């Protein structure tokens, strides 16, 4: 690893998609039946429902028949956002193929895939962030310092949710709009489980890299985002917090006494002023985030910006906090997910004189997350220019076939392409590349910053 690599970080994002079949003329298919249609082309070419695709990312079926896409390793936020967008395009292409096969089988209706975190039956599915850390960082100190930030971060980057009546975390209450989709399903602060307890941070130590040098921070409290700017703020602000912790930059003692209670309290208070208990005293989400922003600005002033989007991240961070504090969301309604959705629903409520308990609002909430470019409400707003873009319009489409050029994903994608060109069976995972007929020549790629591999060249040269 070079000095330049030490200034970078590997990022990754895992997205689980909600599945629904709508059939007005017959029985709707179960999620299990839908994903069998959806993944049939994947199984045909990959011989499995768990594959690595052309851009180095992973596509597979998760628990509960949820399609999941895990981005390739990325070392810039632009790479991450583009790679994540490529997942939506890949899955939408599978939807189109699945509906054609269904029609040929005499099955009507449409398949919907949603980038959201909760369904009407009370199930939740996640959006998991991955950050590569240096092994020397004291993990207990890092997680203790990070939890208050993550608990309150939802006022910046929550996806927004229409909460039905009677589902307040601390008792009964009317239907209302909340910051987060995921908050009410969080059951623990820090845990090694991702499904049984749904913690804020998962502690399972699987670095997918040299374990003597790295570990992976796995954050699972976040909502699935749609806006590129919200992605930028989510990962950019968290990266800044991690850099401050790693550098020993003073953040103050702000330990949340009851993280799961706090994350729910904050989600249901759009003013950002609800008081949550700390180990010493109390604070609001606004106060916590204002403190972290002030610390981040001081850190950047002292150490310099480590990439060219840092200034943009700090500015947007401040703008969102101003919007929460004042209630004037006009400056962020084209970039921040919860504010984009809230404006859409508030406008609809006003036109039709509806309360938050109106079934139509719950339907619009769901449709907001549909990845179909012609049916998803967020996609329609984006196409009309009501939502701002961060990257060029073709960035995600380009990332469907192209791996991030700055990481090990490039090696993996090249290996897969060369094997398929030659009609060779292969098996790959995050760190291992293997041709089935040459099992003794498996290649291990432990450095996530490697962008080329002499071992891969030698292997294919040997069998040319």
Curated annotation (Swiss-Prot):
**Known catalytic reactions:** ATP + [prokaryotic ubiquitin-like protein]-L-glutamate + [protein]-L-lysine = ADP + phosphate + N(6)-([prokaryotic ubiquitin-like protein]-gamma-L-glutamyl)-[protein]-L-lysine
Active site per the UniProt annotation: 62 (proton acceptor)
* Single annotated GO MF: ubiquitin-like protein transferase activity
The record's Gene Ontology biological-process terms are: modification-dependent protein catabolic process; proteasomal protein catabolic process; protein pupylation
Pathway per its UniProt entry is: Protein degradation; proteasomal Pup-dependent pathway; Protein modification; protein pupylation
Binding residues for Mg(2+): 14, 60, 68
Where on this chain does ATP bind?
58, 71, 430
Give the record's keywords alphabetically: ATP-binding, Ligase, Magnesium, Metal-binding, Nucleotide-binding, Ubl conjugation pathway
Question: What Enzyme Commission number does this protein have?
Answer: 6.3.1.19
Pfam families membership: Pup_ligase
Q: Which NCBIfam families match?
A: pupylate_PafA
One further remark on this entry is: The reaction mechanism probably proceeds via the activation of Pup by phosphorylation of its C-terminal glutamate, which is then subject to nucleophilic attack by the substrate lysine, resulting in an isopeptide bond and the release of phosphate as a good leaving group.
Q: Which PANTHER family match?
A: PUP DEAMIDASE/DEPUPYLASE, PUP--PROTEIN LIGASE
Q: What does this protein do?
A: Catalyzes the covalent attachment of the prokaryotic ubiquitin-like protein modifier Pup to the proteasomal substrate proteins, thereby targeting them for proteasomal degradation. This tagging system is termed pupylation. The ligation reaction involves the side-chain carboxylate of the C-terminal glutamate of Pup and the side-chain amino group of a substrate lysine.
The entry's family comment says: Belongs to the Pup ligase/Pup deamidase family. Pup-conjugating enzyme subfamily.
Record-given protein name: Pup--protein ligase
Q: Which organism is it from?
A: Micrococcus luteus (strain ATCC 4698 / DSM 20030 / JCM 1464 / CCM 169 / CCUG 5858 / IAM 1056 / NBRC 3333 / NCIMB 9278 / NCTC 2665 / VKM Ac-2230)
Task: Show the taxonomic lineage.
Answer: Bacteria, Bacillati, Actinomycetota, Actinomycetes, Micrococcales
Gene that encodes it: pafA
């Amino acid at each position: 690893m070079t000095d330049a690599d030490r200034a970078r970080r590997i990022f990754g994002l895992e997205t689980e998609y909600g599945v629904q079949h709508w059939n007005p003329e017959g029985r709707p298919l179960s999620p299990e039946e839908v994903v069998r249609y959806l993944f049939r082309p994947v199984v045909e070419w990959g011989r499995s429902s768990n594959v690595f695709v052309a851009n180095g990312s992973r596509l597979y079926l998760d628990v509960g028949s949820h399609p999941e896409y895990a981005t390739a390793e990325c070392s810039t936020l632009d790479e991450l956002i583009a790679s994540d967008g490529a997942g939506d395009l890949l899955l939408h292409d599978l939807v189109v193929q699945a509906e054609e096969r269904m029609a040929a089988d005499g099955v009507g209706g449409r398949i919907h895939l949603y980038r959201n975190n909760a369904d009407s039956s009370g199930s939740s599915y996640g959006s998991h962030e991955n950050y590569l850390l240096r092994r020397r960082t004291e993990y207990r100190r890092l997680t203790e310092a990070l939890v208050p930030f993550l608990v309150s971060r939802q006022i910046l980057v929550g996806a927004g949710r229409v909460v039905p009546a009677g589902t307040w975390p601390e008792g009964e209450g009317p239907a209302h709009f909340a910051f987060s989709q995921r908050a009410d399903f969080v059951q623990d602060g820090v845990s090694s489980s991702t499904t049984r307890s749904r913690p804020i941070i998962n502690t399972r130590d699987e670095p997918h890299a040299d374990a003597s040098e790295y570990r992976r921070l796995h954050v699972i409290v976040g909502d699935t985002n749609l806006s590129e700017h919200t992605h930028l703020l989510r990962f950019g602000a968290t990266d800044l917090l991690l850099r401050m912790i790693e550098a020993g930059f003073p953040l103050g003692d702000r330990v949340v006494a009851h993280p799961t209670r706090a994350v729910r309290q904050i989600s249901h208070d759009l003013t950002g002023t609800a008081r949550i208990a700390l180990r010493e005293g109390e604070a609001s989400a606004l106060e916590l985030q204002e403190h972290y922003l002030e610390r981040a600005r001081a850190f950047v002033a002292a150490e310099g910006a480590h990439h060219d989007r840092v200034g943009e991240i700090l500015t947007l961070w401040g703008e969102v906090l101003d919007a929460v504090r004042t209630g004037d969301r006009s400056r962020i309604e084209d970039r921040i997910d919860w504010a984009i959705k809230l404006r859409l629903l508030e406008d609809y409520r006003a036109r039709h004189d509806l309360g938050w308990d109106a079934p139509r609002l719950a339907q619009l909430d769901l449709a907001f997350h549909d990845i179909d470019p012609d049916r998803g409400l967020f996609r329609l707003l984006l196409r009309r220019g009501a939502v701002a873009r961060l990257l060029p319009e073709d960035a995600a489409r380009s990332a469907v076939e192209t791996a991030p050029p700055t990481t090990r994903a490039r090696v993996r994608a090249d290996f897969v392409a060369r094997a398929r060109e030659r009609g060779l069976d292969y098996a790959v995972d995050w760190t291992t590349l293997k041709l089935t007929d040459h099992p003794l020549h498996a290649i291990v790629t432990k450095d996530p910053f490697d962008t080329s591999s002499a071992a891969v060249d030698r292997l294919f040269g040997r069998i040319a």
